[in-house]
């Protein structure tokens, strides 16, 4: 059975809990051994597959479940709160693939895939089918072979992206102004905030960049992301800060300024409110 082969392959590669980033270009694999009631994370734009165990994303209006039957599609960087369901003998085993826009553009140019201009960017679950499992199995079998990783893995990644783009929520991977200019503007601004997290943002400037009124921009941004633009900016900064704090020989003060805070006390206060402990508690020094 394909999924059993995939589980064994990931288990063999990751002996202990953790994540291997860019095991091939644009692909991470991960293993989580313990259940957790509430985990705050920031997911990048892309696709997340789980082959064993389960995760739930807690939205204001619903719960999104992804597991061995359903995968996750994200059209932009998204701060989320999750529940994790894992056991010592059955850890979560998963894989994440970047949404490479160049590959996506090539697929769309050479296929008949099209989308409605009413399709919204956001975060969605989609059913995992045998075509995708077969492609994923072949991709994972490349990981221990350097030549396969260089030559075959990019072909399998493109194949996986093709099947995802053909799915009912495949539009979430591709947000261009061709489909809906306003949705594209929100998606683009969210990507810019994620990449340029050091910058200072205010809602009036963001709305002007999107060519929208402030109130319309605020409402549309919240409709798509589930949070206001300023909440989104703050969460992106704090998640990036948490990532930086896990680096060796770094201080809370340097991280605060690195992510764009002028006030260390404000940074400490907002960090503790979000994660339940201070930045200093997180530091590895």
What positions do the PLM features span?
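N-terminal regulatory/effector-sensing and dimerization cores
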Residues: 19-116
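A short, N-terminal "cap"/entry segment at the start of jelly-roll beta-barrel domains
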Residues: 1-23, 36, 142
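Amphipathic alpha-helical segments enriched in hydrophobic/aromatic residues interleaved with Lys/Arg
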Residues: 106-159, 163, 189-191
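A ubiquitous short alpha-helical element
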Residues: 119-127, 174-177, 204-205
